[in-house]
């Protein structure tokens, strides 16, 4: 199976495993929308949606960098609309965005837990729900 011309909507993806997945799909000629908050470099982590897009395009894929916080329903709606407008639909949804805490449970502040829950559970559910109508058409 080839991903040539298929459109992937990915949350996260500006670095780490998400970027590696996107690069693999780019090598097949896929269209990849990278929806993440990383428009500017993080002081401790390399990569932005723009640097990821350059890497994707350098490997033969088409990229659409979208600034998006997947906790925000309006931002997700707008990101999906931008992807559909640019590429004509969505064939694959990859929920890659995540928030983690390297601390033991007893030392994890509730504010950090709330962030992890909003991104990892709610954001994943919402993105899947919002992509579903497009995936059914694919």
Which residues make up each language-model segment?
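Conserved glycine-rich cofactor-binding loop
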Residues: 7, 14-15
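Active-site loop of short-chain dehydrogenase/reductase
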Residues: 6, 61-62, 89-90, 135-138
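Substrate-binding pocket helix/loop in short-chain dehydrogenase/reductase
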Residues: 104-114
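A short, exposed helix-loop element centered on a Lys and neighboring polar residues
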Residues: 128-129
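The beta1-alpha1 cofactor-binding region of Rossmann-like NAD(H)/NADP(H)-dependent oxidoreductases
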Residues: 47, 67-79, 110
């Amino acid at each position: 199976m080839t991903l040539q011309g298929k459109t992937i909507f990915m949350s996260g993806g500006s670095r780490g495993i998400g970027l590696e997945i996107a690069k693999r799909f780019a090598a097949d000629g896929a269209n990849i929308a990278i929806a993440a908050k990383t428009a500017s470099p993080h002081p401790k982590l390399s990569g932005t949606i723009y640097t990821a897009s350059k890497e994707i395009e350098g490997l033969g894929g088409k990229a659409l960098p979208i600034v998006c916080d997947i906790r925000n329903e309006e931002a997700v709606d707008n990101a999906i609309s931008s992807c559909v407008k640019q590429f004509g639909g969505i064939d694959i949804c990859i929920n890659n965005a995540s928030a983690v805490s390297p601390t033991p449970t007893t030392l994890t502040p509730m504010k950090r837990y709330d962030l992890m829950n909003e991104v990892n559970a709610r954001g994943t559910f919402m993105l899947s729900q919002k992509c579903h109508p497009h995936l059914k058409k694919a």
